[in-house]
UniProtKB/Swiss-Prot annotation:
It comes from Tolumonas auensis (strain DSM 9187 / NBRC 110442 / TA 4). It is found in: Cell membrane. GO terms for cellular component: cytosol; plasma membrane. This is 3-octaprenyl-4-hydroxybenzoate carboxy-lyase. Prenylated FMN binds at residues 175-177, 189-191, 194-195. NCBIfam families: PRK10922.1, UbiD family decarboxylase.
Length: 489
């Protein structure tokens, strides 16, 4: 499936009964959040608020409110096919030459799709149909959501922030929330380890005191949006990965104020700069944890140009206690992660990030255990494998007979195969989510690994229990009798 732009995707969702147009006047202040939250919790459609109070621009919400819509956005027909996306990423992360002629032919479709990875630069693009500069730049024209009663100000949530460091060829795309500060200013909340923050830090080292160019694109095509939230290898541009997902090259156009590339079909584009040393207090905001976060200082993004398509659509979301849209993205991206971790650790059977755990704070891993201490090795591997997993506070490792996605199975394994003192691994002073107020220091906390596997000689001195299983012949006999017994008639 190919979507040239966000509007193509909206049309597809509408055809499939997965988009609802809301014609009543709805206030971006709290009302949109309440409607979107109720809809998402009922596994409802994406929402297009056509008459937002105080603005002429419609608001698109709940776009990726189900894992199925995430799969469609990635060009796949169903969620299970996202494993194929993970296979592509595993190959791109650690490419291997074909092992023979058969392997070469098997990989030809992927090699063909790799041809779509270079961007296609345009001289003109719809995202620059309307150009506003200077005093004409006014973010108050946009229906920016004020999501929760305790939020300090409206918040731009789905902006794709585009940056480039002084030492890299590739441009980085990331999604960072941005507090509305003034008609032409936002606060850029990015954490130190994120790509945009790294680019800014390196820029300040190379160009002390000089403004750092930044572009924020709102309402890009789904492949580009999802490319920005997928853990692509550091050497690969999100634009290139979006081309792989879309099966056609990502179309970009040069920004008006700098050399950064802008998604050609984006609905709204904000161009400007960060001035080193210019910061402002950000927050509090309700976040994906289900709590309001602390106030902290972050850099101010000054906007010099605002460009947009004719009849632009403002793309927005909210975050709150799961399930929310980030949690649904997490469920879908979980399927992408499985082939990635399996390539590094072939003994892994399944890898699950429960959405109740704020998408990444807890992982359940099932393995084909081969030796004493194997579970602990897997714990350490998970925490160190992808940058995203350094925020995972709890890793539970179980045997392959346990369904990682069934809490009945997992809790049974924890309570029958674990000794709390022997099988719990605690690690202090590790990187942790800055939004995790439970940690003793912001950004620094502990991790817990739970070894819920059967214990091998060397891990226990006792005879280990044998699981109960019914005789197979008896089960077959009862299967034959079952309907005639009439127990549930």
């Amino acid at each position: 499936m190919k979507y040239r732009d966000l509007r193509d995707f909206i049309q597809l969702l509408e055809q499939r009964g997965q988009l609802k147009r809301i014609k009543q006047e709805i206030d971006p202040y709290l009302e949109m959040t309440e409607i979107a939250d109720r809809t998402l919790r009922a596994q409802g459609p994406a929402l297009l608020f056509e008459n937002p109070k105080g603005s002429r621009y419609p608001v698109l919400a709940n776009l990726f409110g189900t894992p199925q819509r995430v799969a469609w956005g990635m060009g796949q027909e169903d969620v299970s096919a996202l494993r194929d996306v993970g296979e592509w990423m595993a190959m791109l992360k650690e490419p291997e030459p074909p092992k023979g002629l058969r392997d070469l032919f098997d990989k030809l479709p992927l090699f063909k799709q790799i041809l779509n990875m270079p961007v296609k630069r345009l001289s003109k693009a719809p995202c620059q149909d309307i150009i506003l500069t200077g005093d004409d730049v006014d973010l108050n024209q946009l229906p920016v959501q004020h999501c929760w009663p305790g939020d300090v100000a409206p918040l731009v949530t789905w902006g794709l922030t585009i940056t480039k460091g002084p030492y890299k060829k590739r441009q980085n795309l990331g999604i960072y929330r941005q507090q509305l500060l003034a008609k032409n200013k936002l606060i850029m909340r990015w954490l130190d380890h994120r790509g945009g923050a790294i680019d800014f830090r390196e820029w300040q080292e190379a160009h002390p005191g000089e403004p750092f160019p930044v572009v924020v694109a709102i309402g890009a095509d789904p492949a580009t949006i999802l490319g920005a939230v997928t853990p692509v290898p550091d050497t690969l541009s999100e634009y290139a990965f979006a081309g792989l997902l879309r099966q056609s090259r990502t179309e970009v156009v040069k920004a008006l104020s700098c050399d950064l590339d802008v998604p050609a079909s984006a609905e709204i584009v904000l161009e400007g700069y960060l001035m080193p040393g210019e910061t402002a207090p950000e927050g509090p905001y309700g976040d994906h944890t289900g709590y309001y976060n602390e106030v902290d200082d972050f850099s101010v993004f000054t906007i010099t140009h605002m460009t947009m398509r004719k009849d632009a659509i403002y793309h927005s979301t909210y975050t709150g206690r799961p399930p929310d849209e980030p949690a649904m993205l997490g469920v879908a991206l979980n399927e992408v992660f499985v082939p990635l971790v399996r390539k590094q650790f072939p003994e892994i059977v399944d890898f699950y990030l429960p959405p109740e755990g704020c998408s990444y704070r807890m992982a359940v891993v099932t393995i084909k255990k081969r030796y004493p201490g194997h579970a602990k090795r897997v714990m350490m591997g998970v925490w160190s494998f992808l940058r995203q997993f350094m925020y995972t506070k709890f890793v539970i490792v179980c045997d392959e007979d346990v369904n990682a996605r069934d809490w009945n199975d997992v809790i049974w394994a924890i309570t029958t195969r674990m000794d709390p003192a022997r099988d719990t691994t605690l690690i202090e002073h590790t990187p942790i989510d800055y939004l995790d107020f439970a940690s003793p220091v912001a950004g620094l906390g502990s991790k817990m690994g739970l070894d819920a596997t059967n214990k091998w000689p060397g891990e226990t001195q006792r005879e280990w229990g044998t699981p109960i299983h019914m005789d197979e012949a008896v089960k077959r006999r009862v299967d034959e009798l079952w309907d005639s017994l009439g127990i549930f008639d």
